[in-house]
Every structure is written in C-alpha cells, then in structure tokens.
C-alpha cells in the first residue's frame, strides 16, 4: 500500500429538515477543514427539505469566499441518493461523507483524511459509546451482522456514514446504475484496502431522527436486495424444509388417528388450521420478497434518473462530470440538473 497524494478534500453532507443544526454544522465543519493542509469544499445537498434548510444553504454558498456548494434537489429521494448527487458535484481526491445531525462530530475529519493519505481506499468509522435508543441499536447490530456475512468484509459499523473514500472509489460508484444503493456496501465492493477508526458519537441536539420504523424496514429491504441474492436461495431452502415438515406432520397425524381414534383432538381441525396459517404466511413472505426484487428490477430497467438536481450554487469552478464507459460508449452524466449557478 502506497501513500495517496491529496490536493483537495470534499465533504458531502445530505440535509433534510435540519435548519436548527445548519449554522453550527457549517461553523464546525469549516473549522475542521481549515486544519487541513489541502484545498477543501463543503457540499451540502438539500434532499427536498420542507423547512428553511434550502434557503440557508443557498445563503451560505452565496457568501464571498465561501467554500460551500449548495446542491438543491427538487424533492426527497433519500439519504443515499442525496449523497450520490453530492458525489457528482465534488472535485476532491478524497471525499468524506457526514450526517447533518452533528451526532458524528466534524472534528473527526482530519483523522479520516490522515488515514486516507496513508493509501486506504475506504476509511470507515465505528461509533464509540453510541448515543441512540435500543430501538435503533439492536436493528443496526442485526444489519451489520447480515452485511458482514453476505459481503465477507468484516467492518463493524455499516450504519455510520462518517467515512472517507478515494476518488477512484467515488467514480466507480457513480458508474453504477442501480437505483437502490447502500453506499458503504457498494464502496467496499470496489475497495482493496479498508480500515476503521473509532469516533465519538453524541446525542442529537436538534430535531428528531429521519429514520422512522417504516424507513428502517425499507432500509433493511434495500440492504437485502442490493447486496445479495441469498434471500432468493433461502426461499428454496425454506420451501423444501416446510414441505418435508408437512409430510412428517401428515404422517404423525395418521399415526395419532390410528392410535387414539378420530376424537383425540377434535378431528384435528385446529391443528389443520394452524398448519394452514403457517404455510400461507410462508407463501406471502416469499411472494413479498420476490415482489421486492421484481420491483427494483423494474425501476432499474426504466433507467430514470436517481434524482433531479434543481440547481447548484458555488463560488468555485464546477467539477467535471464523471466519465462513464458503457459498452464502448462514453457518457459524462448520470443524473438530471435543471440549473447550475
């Protein structure tokens, strides 16, 4: 592993209804970036906020000498789509992603850049003494275990978005066309050298988490369907297992009837109902999982943009559009933008 030359660092931050956190976020992130020995830019992507977040970002980008780039999406597309929109606009040799809620402190940015300069393709982080509720921690642990088993990459905390990526990794992710993207997993698929560092984790000071129970369930389906086809194989295994259990149970019912007569359990009516519910439930679970895969395939086949950029405001020269080679054809754009200032 060789040291990686760095000339510019990009910080990409998705923003959704974070107007209370934005002033402190900008102040602390700018202070952390000024400690770096490189040029820097802070790219904030408004993901269809319903509060005043978009206007605050535009004002910050319009200030004289500002290193802030405001990317305004026309509606809410989700955290990972917003980060991909920021990736398209960044020009750094190292790109760092950061949440806007300040639970992961921007002061950790220099440490991530230091590790990336050593030659790592991906620098991940692990939240030390995580300040979330058990409702958030336990599903996160299950997801981390599932991801580790499926990808074979033993990283501890896939849910922490404070990460650093080498430019080549970002370009490789931009070349991917699927709509359902989980960035840490996608990046690890392209990385040769990865590492993890412990970072501080604070309680959320403003607002509330944007991940409700339904969004966490949706995220779990995204993880299952974007990283592996193992659930489809498991359906076959479960189907064979249930069929075998059904035959064994039928044999047991015959033996019980011969041994104890027809009245031993009310003619077996309730047992049959229980078996019916189990099999019906299993069928619906399988149909739902197949529907998830088919729905995502349908979305990918339509090839619509993952997001629509309404406008971009910056005081710096725009980053060149990433060049993507597909079947010998060169494409230089992966989304749609209405206005760039």
From Swiss-Prot:
Q: Does the keyword Mitochondrion feature in the UniProt annotation? A: no
The record's subcellular locations are:
Cell inner membrane
Q: In which pathway does it act?
A: Glycolipid biosynthesis; 4-amino-4-deoxy-alpha-L-arabinose undecaprenyl phosphate biosynthesis; 4-amino-4-deoxy-alpha-L-arabinose undecaprenyl phosphate from UDP-4-deoxy-4-formamido-beta-L-arabinose and undecaprenyl phosphate: step 1/2; Bacterial outer membrane biogenesis; lipopolysaccharide biosynthesis
Top-level division of the source organism's lineage: Bacteria
This protein's GO cellular component annotations are:
plasma membrane
Q: Which family does it belong to?
A: Belongs to the glycosyltransferase 2 family.
**Organism for this UniProt entry:** Pseudomonas fluorescens (strain SBW25)
Q: Membrane-spanning residues where?
A: 235-255, 269-289
Q: Which reaction does it catalyse?
A: UDP-4-deoxy-4-formamido-beta-L-arabinose + di-trans,octa-cis-undecaprenyl phosphate = 4-deoxy-4-formamido-alpha-L-arabinopyranosyl di-trans,octa-cis-undecaprenyl phosphate + UDP
Tell me the membrane topology, using the record's own terms. Answer: Multi-pass membrane protein
Give the EC number(s) listed in the UniProt record. Answer: 2.4.2.53
Keyword terms of this UniProt record: Antibiotic resistance, Cell inner membrane, Cell membrane, Glycosyltransferase, Lipid A biosynthesis, Lipid biosynthesis, Lipid metabolism, Lipopolysaccharide biosynthesis, Membrane, Transferase, Transmembrane, Transmembrane helix
Q: Does the keyword Transmembrane apply?
A: yes
Task: Please give the name of this protein.
Answer: Undecaprenyl-phosphate 4-deoxy-4-formamido-L-arabinose transferase
